[in-house]
Amino acid sequence: DREIIRLYRAGSYRIYDREGFSLSLVAYTDKVEGLTIKGAKYEVEDCLLTNAFPLGISNVVKGFDGQDRKYAEISFKSGYLLSVQSKMVTDF
């Protein structure tokens, strides 16, 4: 399990942390409107994400205070969004 790829339609979702994995969010359609990311290292609110500008690459799930299992919350108003959780390489 080096990568987990999911496709989301407009709505609200939780993406659970996998130890040692990064989180990338990529617009599958031309644009994803109203993207909000909370509980991640890099958070955004009501952002426009396009497939021409990879703004959502290499994030990390940080979670919220008091959580037993860490997750990030994502929501968006239109478009389709790919999430890619990739095992981070630590040995060079």
Q: Residue locations for each model-derived region?
A:
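Long, charged alpha-helical interface segments
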Residues: 2, 7-92
